């Protein structure tokens, strides 16, 4: 086991396929558990891009709402700052969220030797007939996290989450 990094910075980007289209969120205020809702379309594929700093960290998959997404190491960024992993998240078979409701979905990403990143996204899944609703709100490129691994190497504490 190597040294435990003081801070881990990671970003998670979602792009709807096949055209790498943007994913949107809306601000719901305090009506639900979280103030931001990510809008996703059922029966669709999303490219997941995870960027991690420091570059010595390794990850094999991310679980999004219980769907295991294998991640493939793509590259280091040209400046050598972060390592980039990609995978495909498929919403085939996911039930649309009922009107007026939101779904909390668990996100987990186990890292080799330093513990598991965990967070919860508030999501609304729309079916094909309401697909235009997925484009109402604000597009985001990435969700960035600043995390601190705990001493037992079991979990990482999320210090900061930013939608950019």
Curated annotation (Swiss-Prot):
This is CB1 cannabinoid receptor-interacting protein 1. GO terms for molecular function: type 1 cannabinoid receptor binding. Suppresses cannabinoid receptor CNR1-mediated tonic inhibition of voltage-gated calcium channels. It comes from the Eukaryota. Belongs to the CNRIP family. It comes from Rattus norvegicus. GO terms for biological process: regulation of trans-synaptic signaling by endocannabinoid, modulating synaptic transmission. One of its GO terms (cellular component) is GABA-ergic synapse. Interacts with the cannabinoid receptor CNR1 (via C-terminus). Does not interact with cannabinoid receptor CNR2.
């Amino acid at each position: 086991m190597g040294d435990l990094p003081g801070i881990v910075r990671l970003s998670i980007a979602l792009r709807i396929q096949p055209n790498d289209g943007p994913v949107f969120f809306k601000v719901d205020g305090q009506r639900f558990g979280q103030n931001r809702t990510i809008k996703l379309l059922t029966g669709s594929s999303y490219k997941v891009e995870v960027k991690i700093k420091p570059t010595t960290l390794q990850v094999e998959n991310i679980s999004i709402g219980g769907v295991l997404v294998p991640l493939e190491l793509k590259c280091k960024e040209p400046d050598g700052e972060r390592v980039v992993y990609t995978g495909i998240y498929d919403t085939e078979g996911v039930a649309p969220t009922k009107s007026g409701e939101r779904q909390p979905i668990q996100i987990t990403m186990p890292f080799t030797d330093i513990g598991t990143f965990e967070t919860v996204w508030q999501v609304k899944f729309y079916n094909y007939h309401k697909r235009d609703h997925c484009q109402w709100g604000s597009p985001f490129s990435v969700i960035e996290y600043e995390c601190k691994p705990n001493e037992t190497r079991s979990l990482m504490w999320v210090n900061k989450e930013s939608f950019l």
